[in-house]
């Protein structure tokens, strides 16, 4: 095939088919799915690999952002607030000269040693109500606070972001003050402002303090599983700061953890098909596009009458529907009419009733990242 006739749009279709393929289905399967009866126009695998290097991942990024932009008017809110959650993920990359030269190295396992395979550190902003990725950042080193600060600036004023204990810091609070939106941190006892530390050690159940003109509320809520108090810090309006509302609102943060399972286990994102950073990023943006596309189509076919803070809810089987969409990706990219007609039926038959916090398991750590002891942990080191 003449490289001059090979457009970024055509490459996007091939990469989507490539990452959507079953196990051991590589370039040739993806090319056959895209070209179909036009096999004489199909490039060789070696030619495609060379063409991939000429097309920047920025085209894939723009396609991902265009999908989000089109979906924006239809997003779900709760009491006029968008609800986000931010967390980080560590991904393994192939070890090649191109990736190492880009600054990606292994994870430190001691003072003088690091793992052989390079790591990419991903920070993910997730819309917990719509189930869609709002934004993500990637780096050669873990820097989730900086990523969160940059992403908060992209959020709407009528939004709240949920964080775990890592994120509570003055820098991130200032970012929310500047943007004018809300936050909800699960607080930690050390490495935080003096007012938060004193509240941890006191017998008070509620408190507040002023930080650079902003009133921040502190509340203790007993964890029914661990029988210990969790402390939360927020700038939400006072009528929101109740035990029931804060606990159920923070429970929604688990959606971002589930999204990482979908990315690594369901979508198998770490099964890369390139040895170059540009190719890795092409696949990363393409996979987020496929996941977002599936989530959006599911969202548009479901009623949104339930309160998201209810402890009981129903949810369809994402893995089933994701694989069903992957099998039809060629027709979807070619804009075949009525190709998704069966999705509503799949949502109906796979939907299950669930309940937040109905089950809990102690963490298992097989490869500790720190020499310090972990609380509430089962050690299972082989």
Predicted ranges, named:
Residues 1-27, 47, 52-55, 59-63, ...:
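Single, function-defining residue in the core of a domain
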Residues 23-38:
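Extended, structured, electrostatic nucleic-acid-contact surfaces
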Residues 82-84:
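Conserved beta-strand elements of the Class I
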């Amino acid at each position: 095939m003449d490289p001059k006739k090979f457009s970024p749009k055509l490459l996007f279709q091939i990469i989507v088919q490539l990452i959507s393929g079953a196990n051991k289905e590589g370039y040739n399967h993806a090319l056959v799915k895209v070209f179909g009866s036009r096999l004489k126009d199909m490039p060789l695998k070696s030619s495609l690999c060379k063409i991939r290097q000429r097309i920047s991942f920025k085209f894939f990024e723009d396609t991902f952002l265009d999908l989000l932009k089109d979906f924006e008017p239809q997003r779900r809110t709760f009491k006029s607030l968008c609800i986000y959650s931010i967390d980080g993920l560590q991904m393994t990359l192939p070890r090649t000269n191109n990736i190492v030269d880009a600054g990606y190295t292994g994870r430190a396992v001691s003072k003088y040693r690091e793992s052989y395979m390079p790591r990419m550190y991903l920070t993910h902003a997730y819309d917990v109500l719509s189930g869609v990725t709002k934004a993500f950042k990637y780096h050669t080193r873990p820097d989730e606070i900086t990523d969160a600060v940059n992403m908060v600036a992209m959020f709407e004023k009528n939004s709240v972001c949920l964080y775990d204990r890592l994120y509570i810091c003055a820098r991130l609070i200032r970012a929310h003050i500047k943007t004018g939106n809300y936050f909800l941190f699960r607080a930690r006892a050390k490495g935080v402002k003096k007012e938060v530390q004193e509240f941890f050690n006191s017998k008070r159940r509620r408190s507040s303090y002023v930080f650079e003109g902003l009133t921040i509320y502190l509340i203790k809520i007993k964890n029914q599983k661990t029988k210990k108090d969790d402390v939360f810090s927020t700038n939400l309006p006072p009528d929101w700061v109740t035990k029931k509302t804060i606990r159920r609102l923070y429970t929604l943060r688990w959606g971002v953890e589930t999204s990482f399972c979908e990315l690594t286990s369901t979508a198998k994102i770490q099964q890369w098909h390139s040895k170059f950073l540009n190719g890795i990023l092409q696949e990363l943006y393409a996979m987020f596009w496929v996941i977002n596309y599936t989530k959006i189509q599911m969202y548009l076919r479901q009623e949104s009458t339930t309160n998201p803070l209810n402890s009981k809810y129903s949810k369809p089987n994402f893995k089933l529907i994701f694989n069903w969409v992957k099998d039809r990706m060629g027709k979807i990219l070619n804009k075949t009419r009525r190709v998704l007609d069966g999705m509503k039926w799949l949502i109906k038959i796979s939907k299950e009733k669930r309940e937040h916090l109905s089950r809990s398991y102690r963490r298992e750590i097989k490869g500790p990242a720190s020499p310090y002891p972990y609380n509430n942990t089962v050690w299972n080191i082989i």
